[in-house]
From Swiss-Prot:
GO terms for cellular component: endomembrane system; SNARE complex. It comes from Dictyostelium discoideum (Social amoeba). The keyword Transmembrane applies. Belongs to the syntaxin family. This is Probable syntaxin-8B. The lineage of its organism: Eukaryota, Amoebozoa, Evosea, Eumycetozoa, Dictyostelia. Residues 1-213 are cytoplasmic.
Amino acid sequence: MGDYWLNEHDNIVKLINSLTADIKEYSIQQRNNPGIVQKNTPAKLRNGLVHITNEILRLQDSLTYGNNRNIQEKELLRRKNKVESLISMKNQLNSTLDAAINNTSQKNELMGNNNGVGIGYSNRQFGKPKETEATKQFDNQQLFTNQQHIMREQDESLDLLSQSIMRQKNMAHAMSNELDQHNEMLDDVEIGTDAVSMRLRNANRRMETIKQNAGSTCMIVCIVILIILIVVLIATDSGCKIYNDPKHCP
């Protein structure tokens, strides 16, 4: 199984590349055929950038507050550099998105809106704004009610966004806790491995001592056997033959 942190880093890089392609496509459509561009496209692109920012912060927090005891200092520094690179990419992406949106706004001001305002004419209106067809039949109370309805919809959208962020936060905490548990298990395994290694080293030292003692014992036994053999030879006919002396004959 691959490293979880590196997998998350690769996923963020994919998100950045995907959003970069979306911004480029948005700019091309605004330049060539602005009529097919949806009005909520800038908001979607901005939300994508916010999501990437949150993912980078979560990845950065895992290095700052996570359990990194099993990561070497060199690898930890390399991962911090990767996060800095992601932040630079995100900032560049933010500048690109701002430029695309600002160019769109400036073009709309220069060229006019899609309701037939020609080149060189501003869509600025003086005096009372033109009433829309949707609110034309409303009285003051109905306008107030409609405005409250719009505000409630905006509040509901914000609540949904807040709930989504909270779910992501809870998921991040759950993954962090799970990683801590895995790290604790790995620490236990490492401690057990160290204990077994120490026992093996002690056993090897004992074996070496036994080998040395066995060698000394064998030498002593051999000397004793030789002495006994010499005594036996002297006390038997073999001694008489060896010395060729009647004194050594039984």
